[in-house]
């Protein structure tokens, strides 16, 4: 199926394997591409792309099942019966087959006039996914086909990309009217989920293409893998993330025994649309299973993942001689991952992607760390359950940004809050100034009006996907920058001054675009009339010819009517015959002898004349030449804009930061948020704190007022470091825990917070152990998920961390769960020392307050009434006296008979299991021991006391009984 192997040589003398490989399950398919295309991109670097398809195939070779089951799409265009093989069909179908061979793993959209057509299996899949009518091109050979109009193709491409398909666009490279041969066609772009540029992308979300790489997993310089590991005794993994649609490009590196898990976690946090891995990469099955959550997973040849190939490619892209200035000195894996992503983009887009001109190496210590579990549990950017209202997320609650760039920065800031006190304080100062001056704040926010997505407009221009209206939209957006700069210049805080200095108004770019393009250009260049008058003298002359030519045609019509005496004579035009004179059959006898017959109709005859032919030539050639000139001028304009790409990106980043700060100030003013105070000690002290999401939800739905509560944690010498929160379900324990995390997140984002006051020592990482719904659905037990997440916390948390543990131990037997919860509290108290909130239904744990110095009991407020209980939703000092579980069940609507029976059973168990406090001590045992709260000995003593008739005992008998029980405890306790 593949073409002959082609070997190319890049600028570094590296022999490269064939250009394209498709891995269909375990079958490897090879194919080639054109050296001329790749030489202009990566100096001869081959594509090196593989795609793994995990879907089952049906009998025709088409992928069955939903696209969510498909890693990345792969079809064989030649999987037809021999008598229907397109390679032996018409020249057109042979042309199609050649293009399909170059892109066997993509749906081939083949341009035919005003339509993109698909054939064979591609047509069957597109028909099913897009609800298109499936027809046949050749009735005898039964070639399935379907198509979509070229002017509406974007919406169809978007639907396919969102479902994980890969698409190749094969366009006409010459005007069909100018050739009598088969129109030349080439694949101009390959679209993948990770390289999508369509307008359907969410304006507040990135569309990341990711690379996941472990140093040594590929063939370094085509030698044995072991050679690549020399000097790397520890595991080194890297993740690179590139949003082609905005130019955002970053990479990170992880080292040590947990590097693989950290890399996968970083990857999933970014929620990429597509992930790249080396062809030979073998990751642990549990981590590889997590990667299945990514819509598309693609394999790239090993030679791409080498220092010799990847690093020089990144240097060329960034136009530097070394990557040290980007913080990548000593971080080879991160640089290689970045190079693999770049190579994939340049190859699929057949473009150098000039808008990608910067790379950020992310230092983990620079941000408050969050893992995917915490992001999911706290519902920071996505609801916990599919289909749930996204207003339950922190992102939607805080999103008062007015530009797409600001919205994306807000999302990124939520996922990576700051961990640098100076940077946080700088944001506080800027927010405080805008918060305190309504007029200046609103002036800044008004200036954002009309600023479109500068980053994505620039990307479309860079990748040659922009139409005239996109470039005009760029100019309209840039025209708003002077007003924004004036508004920001009025501010005095340091960060506002920095933004003003970075904000280039780009008036030269705005003026050039406005001068070159008409005010309201057509959708495409092919429509003509894009370039403004006065830009090109030849273009203006050709337009005059075209206009005057049409006037001349009208004059010819009038003259010929007078000459022939035929009042109904018409001069008309169509694309087949050009200009012609039409005379009805009744007037044919009046036709002059110099008329040349062109066409006979039922009721008329059509003629031409030498004069009409000459005018036709002038008019049509003028139009075609005009389009050529307009394309040239538009290309020059595009090049000019791209020369300012770095300036546009810097200004776009400045707009985003200004939008974010103005958003924080707007929220603070409207929602009574206050400025946090940063402390050197590891403290979390909040007065009258509220949960930002729930508070806003209650206000919008008018469901009452949120009850504020205090929080005090101190991992230093004073105050409690661990709060044990008890009380009934539905009482507010989980809300209280999450509320503490939200305060920390917002404070370290640089935002004001929903509290009367907050004093905070910076947190290095937030851990949560709350739910397990996602992993349970993937076959892992609730208890296993819980223990795995708890192990991560105990093994990696530091004194500066914030830990939230909600109902630990509920997934196993009562005594096992209690024992593990007890031991975990002891460990967190004695070893970790982190600020911890521990919500529990094990009331026995409240005894630890007496044993452990920095443990404090809190309970949710409950009011008992004749009709049951009322949740007060306030947090009180002390332990809950009981769980009220049966009362909660009654409120949930369980039948009265069940409630009464439950009360009876509860009383029985309380009598049977009433016992003394556990003997366990807070100190850690030298050897592992099973913590036993209730022992058979204790139960026997309780049973003996309950069976004794105290009223029948004499004082002496009572003393003797007490002595016996005491002696038994000493001997067997």
Annotate each language-model stretch with its function.
Residues 929-940, 948:
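C-terminal low-complexity, glycine/proline- and small-hydrophobic-enriched intrinsically disordered tails
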Residues 170, 193-201, 352, 492-495, ...:
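Active-site phosphate-binding and catalytic loops of NTP-dependent enzymes
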Residues 467, 480, 533-534, 558-568, ...:
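Charged, surface-exposed helical/loop "interaction arms" that form contiguous linear patches used
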Residues 2-61, 65-433, 446-462, 466-558, ...:
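Charged catalytic and DNA/RNA-contacting regions of genome-maintenance
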Residues 120-123, 222, 234, 331, ...:
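ATPase nucleotide-binding head domains, primarily ABC-like/P-loop NTPase cores
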Residues 107-110, 114, 554, 561-585:
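Extended, charged helical/alpha-beta scaffold domains that provide interaction surfaces
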Residues 574, 933, 949-973:
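Terminal-proximal interaction/regulatory segments of ATP-powered molecular machines
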Residues 601, 605-639:
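Extended, charged coiled-coil "arm/hinge" scaffolds of SMC/Rad50-like chromosome-maintenance ATPases
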């Amino acid at each position: 199926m593949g073409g002959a192997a082609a070997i190319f040589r890049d600028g570094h003398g590296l022999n490269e394997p064939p250009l394209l490989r498709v891995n269909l399950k375990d079958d490897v398919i090879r194919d080639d591409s054109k050296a001329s295309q790749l030489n202009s991109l990566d100096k001869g670097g081959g594509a090196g792309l593989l795609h793994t398809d995990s879907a089952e195939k049906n009998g025709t070779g088409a992928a069955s099942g939903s696209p969510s089951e498909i890693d990345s799409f792969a079809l064989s265009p030649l999987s037809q019966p021999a008598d229907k093989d397109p390679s032996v069909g018409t020249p057109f179908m042979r042309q199609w087959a050649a293009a399909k061979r170059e892109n066997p793993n993509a749906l081939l959209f083949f341009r035919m006039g005003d339509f993109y057509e698909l054939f064979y299996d591609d047509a069957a899949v597109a028909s099913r996914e897009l609800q298109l009518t499936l027809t046949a091109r050749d009735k005898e050979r039964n070639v399935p086909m379907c198509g979509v109009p070229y002017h509406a193709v974007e919406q169809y491409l978007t639907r396919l990309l969102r479902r994980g398909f890969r698409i190749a666009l094969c366009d006409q490279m010459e005007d069909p009217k100018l050739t009598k041969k088969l129109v030349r066609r080439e694949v101009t772009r390959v679209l993948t989920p990770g390289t999508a540029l369509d307008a359907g992308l969410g304006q507040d979300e990135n569309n990341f293409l990711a690379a996941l790489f472990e140093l040594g997993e590929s063939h370094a310089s085509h030698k044995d893998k072991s050679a690549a590991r020399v000097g790397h005794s520890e595991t080194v993994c890297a993740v690179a993330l590139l949003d082609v649609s905005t130019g955002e490009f970053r990479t990170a590196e992880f080292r040590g025994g947990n590097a693989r898990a950290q890399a996968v976690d970083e990857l999933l946090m970014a929620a990429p649309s597509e992930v790249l891995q080396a062809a030979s990469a073998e990751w642990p099955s549990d981590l590889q299973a997590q990667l299945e959550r990514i819509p598309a997973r693609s394999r790239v040849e090993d030679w791409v993942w080498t220092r010799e190939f990847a690093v020089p490619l990144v240097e060329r892209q960034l136009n530097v001689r070394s990557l040290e200035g980007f913080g990548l000195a000593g971080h080879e894996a991160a640089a290689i991952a970045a190079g693999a992503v770049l190579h994939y983009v340049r190859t699929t887009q057949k473009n150098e992607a000039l808008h990608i001109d910067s790379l950020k190496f992310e230092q983990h210590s620079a941000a408050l760390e969050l893992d995917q579990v915490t992001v999911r549990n706290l519902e920071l950017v996505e609801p916990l359950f599919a289909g749930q209202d996204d207003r339950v997320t922190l992102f939607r609650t805080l999103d008062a940004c007015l530009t797409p760039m600001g919205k994306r920065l807000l999302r990124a800031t939520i996922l990576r809050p700051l961990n640098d006190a100076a940077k946080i304080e700088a944001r506080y100062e800027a927010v405080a100034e805008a918060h305190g001056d309504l007029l200046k704040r609103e002036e800044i926010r008004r200036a954002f009006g009309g600023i479109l997505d500068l980053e994505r407009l620039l990307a479309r221009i860079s990748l040659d996907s922009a139409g005239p209206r996109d470039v005009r939209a760029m100019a309209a957006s840039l025209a708003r920058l002077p007003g924004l700069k004036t508004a920001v210049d009025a501010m005095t805080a340091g960060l506002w001054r920095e933004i003003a200095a970075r904000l280039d108004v780009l008036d030269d770019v705005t003026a050039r675009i406005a001068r070159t393009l008409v005010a309201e250009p057509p959708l495409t260049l092919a429509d003509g009339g894009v370039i403004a008058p006065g830009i090109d003298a030849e273009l203006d002359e050709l337009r005059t010819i075209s206009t005057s030519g049409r006037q001349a045609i009208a004059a010819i019509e009038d003259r010929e009517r007078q000459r022939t005496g035929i009042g109904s004579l018409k001069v008309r035009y169509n694309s087949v015959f050009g200009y012609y004179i039409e005379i009805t059959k009744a007037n044919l006898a009046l036709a002059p002898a110099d008329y040349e017959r062109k066409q006979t109709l039922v009721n008329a005859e059509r003629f031409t004349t030498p004069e009409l032919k000459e005018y036709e030539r002038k008019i049509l050639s003028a139009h075609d030449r005009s389009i050529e000139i307009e394309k040239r001028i538009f290309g020059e304009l595009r090049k000019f804009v791209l020369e300012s790409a770095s300036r546009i990106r810097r200004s776009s980043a400045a707009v985003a930061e200004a939008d974010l700060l103005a958003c924080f100030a707007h929220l603070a003013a409207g929602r009574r948020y206050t400025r946090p105070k940063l402390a050197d000690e590891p403290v979390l002290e909040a007065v009258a704190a509220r949960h930002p999401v729930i508070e806003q939800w209650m206000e919008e739905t008018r469901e009452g007022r949120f009850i504020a509560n205090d929080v005090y944690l101190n991992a230093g010498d004073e105050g409690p470091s661990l709060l044990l929160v008890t009380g009934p379900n539905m009482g507010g324990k989980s809300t209280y825990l999450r509320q503490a995390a939200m305060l920390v997140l917002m404070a370290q984002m640089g935002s004001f917070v929903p509290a009367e006051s907050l004093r905070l020592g910076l947190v290095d990482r937030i851990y949560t152990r709350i739910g397990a719904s996602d992993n349970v659905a993937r076959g892992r037990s609730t208890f296993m998920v819980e223990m795995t997440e708890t192990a991560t916390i105990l093994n990696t948390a530091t004194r500066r961390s914030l830990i939230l543990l909600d109902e630990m131990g509920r997934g196993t037997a009562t005594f096992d769960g209690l024992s593990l919860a007890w031991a975990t509290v002891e460990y967190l108290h004695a070893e970790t020392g982190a600020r911890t909130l521990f919500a529990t239904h094990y009331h026995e744990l409240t005894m630890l307050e007496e044993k452990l110095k920095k443990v404090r009991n809190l309970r949710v407020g409950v009011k008992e009434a004749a009709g049951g209980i009322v949740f007060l939703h306030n947090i009180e000092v002390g332990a809950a006296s009981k769980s009220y579980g049966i009362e909660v069940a009654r409120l949930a609507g369980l039948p009265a008979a069940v409630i009464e029976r439950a009360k009876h059973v509860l009383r029985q168990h309380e009598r049977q299991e009433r016992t003394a406090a556990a003997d366990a001590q807070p100190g850690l045992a030298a050897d592992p021991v099973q913590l036993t709260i209730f022992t058979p000995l204790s139960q026997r003593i309780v049973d003996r006391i309950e069976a004794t008739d105290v009223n029948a005992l004499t004082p002496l008998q009572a003393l003797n009984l007490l002595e016996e029980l005491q002696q038994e405890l000493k001997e067997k306790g």
